[in-house]
Amino acid sequence: RMLASDPYVDAATIASLGGEKVSEKSLLAQSDFVAVFMILNEQTRHFLNAERLALMPKHSYLINMARGPVIDEVALIKVLQSKSIAGAALDVFEQEPVAADNPLLTMDNVLLAPHSLCWTDECFDHIAREGLGCLAAFAKGERPLSVVKP
């Protein structure tokens, strides 16, 4: 069962994609996995705050594929430390670059991944060219142009 909450998409459109439109509170309270996809603006900054995170079941996981500041990171750290939710998968942080002492970096119930914003043919062409260039530089013992910092 896929639940969705979006103020800009009607129930029929969501149903045509295999989902069921519900309120944000219902979505948070009923979901095993909450995947976040939203733009960052003044209305969405800290959208997932302590109050909303508290609605999530203890066995649930939060997956943020939006922007870091849509989640109140201090509140997220608290719910993860207290095991109020099972875990989180993040590829963005509220403050970037992320501080070396950020607790999210060392938590066993957090999965971290590099962030990739772009999803267009042009972007993939660029990624392929840049990736091959980095591999070639590495093979020659040179430092690649793009290095993901740990």
Give residue ranges: language-model regions:
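Rossmann-like adenosine-cofactor binding region
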Residues: 7-103
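C-terminal helix-to-coil terminal segments
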Residues: 94-150
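Conserved SAM-binding motif I beta-strand of class I
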Residues: 4
